[in-house]
């Protein structure tokens, strides 16, 4: 009996001790602030306050993320001049792959590489963890006041009329 209790306690501790994410960010709450220093730029979320932000967590090794990127680019171009900024945060651990991807695909977005660790259960990175994000792609729409308005888990077709209209209404 004593051995069974010990095994049960170790199992419970083991499962709760392995959790590496934070509490997921909720709609209607302030977006957690962060600063990422990439090789050629530093981006702080709060410095973008006053704009509508589409915050996208992605990586070059993530096929759905790569598939989603063209629609993010198209949406950014369509909404240009309307106070909407796409901030793409890469959790790539390999800087060379990241920079090669940006160059090869002519990515013209505000994008920074935080780096991260790919695991069997998702991805670990400090900024993604602030949002409770462990699976990518994951995106947030943040209003001009820094409040999370929408959250998307998985790839999104950012050209959808519903999304474009939603972003237009936030202006």
Predicted regions and their residues:
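Short, acidic, Ser/Thr-enriched surface-loop or helix-capping motifs
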Residues: 25, 37-38, 142-143
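N-terminal targeting signals for export/organelle localization
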Residues: 1-35, 151, 161-165, 170-171
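Short pre-active-site segment immediately N-terminal to redox-active cysteine/selenocysteine motifs
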Residues: 51-53, 57-61, 135
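Thiol/disulfide oxidoreductase modules built on the thioredoxin-like
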Residues: 105-107, 114-166
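A short beta-strand-turn-helix
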Residues: 33-53, 76
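Structural microenvironment flanking redox-active thiols in thiol-disulfide oxidoreductases
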Residues: 67-107, 118-129
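Residue-level signal for well-ordered, solvent-exposed loop/turn and beta-edge residues enriched
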Residues: 29, 41-42, 147
């Amino acid at each position: 009996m004593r051995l069974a209790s010990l095994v049960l306690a170790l199992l419970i501790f083991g499962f709760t001790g392995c959790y590496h994410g934070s509490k997921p960010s909720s709609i209607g709450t302030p977006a957690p602030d962060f600063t990422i220093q990439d090789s050629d730029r530093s981006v702080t979320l709060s410095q973008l306050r006053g704009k509508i932000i589409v915050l996208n967590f992605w990586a070059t090794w993530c096929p759905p993320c790569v598939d989603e990127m063209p629609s993010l680019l198209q949406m950014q171009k369509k909404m240009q001049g309307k106070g909407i900024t796409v901030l793409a945060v890469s959790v790539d651990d390999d800087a060379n792959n990241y920079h090669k991807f940006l160059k090869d695909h002519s990515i013209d977005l505000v994008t920074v590489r935080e780096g991260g660790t790919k695991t069997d259960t998702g991805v670990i990175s400090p900024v993604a963890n602030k949002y409770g994000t462990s699976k990518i792609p994951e995106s947030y729409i943040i209003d001009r006041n820094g409040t999370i308005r929408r959250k998307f888990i998985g790839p999104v077709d950012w050209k959808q009329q519903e999304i474009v209209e939603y972003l237009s209404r936030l202006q």
